[in-house]
């Protein structure tokens, strides 16, 4: 079964159970959007529908919009589906899964891009797929800046963003050597507070910006 999410622009909220939301709000359709109906409805969505949706969402983004890249695995019992056949499930090794990739706006939390990939798709292929499709649909330099979690931190992904000309903010694992070297320069006072970092009153966080040199090699050498 599938679940449909509805995003309300006016209220700036999202609801993960549409059938419950229908109890208190008027919707474009009087039909009850239960899980079975949503499953049948989602099966009618074609690749052309998906591409048209992404194209329309990109046009609605303001210049310099901020988007976040994320993914999740979805388990399934289908044995003939290509996306599920090669999926590696982290919770149950005997249950295959697909990889659901999406980009959403950090301002409105509305979806901008989504795609289902095979469960064994690595992060480098994921990022390249996202950038390639969004570029084909009209994404230009500086149209959208990307934020990723530490799972996407690699030189290959940095090179993909750099080649696209897209600004990006990439989280990194604290165990990586460049991160360890930066953290080792932080000094603390007798109370355990950092003395060579800035403090942001709004977020109540300490921060410090450092330059880390890295090399990006073009595909043509």
Language-model-detected regions and their locations in the chain:
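Anion-binding and metal-coordination hotspots
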Residues: 1-221
């Amino acid at each position: 079964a599938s679940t449909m999410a509805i995003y309300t622009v006016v209220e700036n909220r999202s609801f993960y159970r549409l059938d419950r939301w229908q109890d208190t709000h008027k919707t474009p359709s009087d039909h009850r959007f239960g899980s079975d109906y949503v499953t049948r409805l989602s099966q009618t969505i074609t690749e052309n529908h998906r591409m048209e949706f992404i194209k329309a969402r990109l046009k609605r983004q303001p210049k310099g919009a901020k988007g976040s890249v994320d993914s999740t695995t979805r388990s399934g019992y289908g044995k003939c589906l290509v996306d599920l056949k090669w999926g590696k499930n982290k919770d149950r090794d005997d249950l295959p899964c697909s990889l659901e990739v999406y980009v959403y706006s950090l301002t409105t939390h509305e979806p901008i891009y989504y795609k289902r990939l095979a469960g064994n798709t690595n992060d480098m292929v994921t990022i390249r797929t996202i950038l390639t499709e969004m570029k084909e649909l009209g994404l230009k330099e500086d149209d959208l800046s990307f934020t990723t979690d530490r799972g996407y931190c690699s030189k290959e992904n940095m090179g993909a963003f750099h080649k696209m000309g897209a600004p990006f903010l990439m989280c990194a694992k604290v165990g990586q050597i460049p991160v360890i070297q930066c953290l080792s320069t932080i000094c603390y006072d007798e109370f355990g507070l950092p003395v060579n970092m800035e403090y942001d009153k709004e977020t109540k966080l300490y921060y410090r910006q450092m330059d880390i040199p890295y090399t990006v090699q073009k595909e043509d050498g």
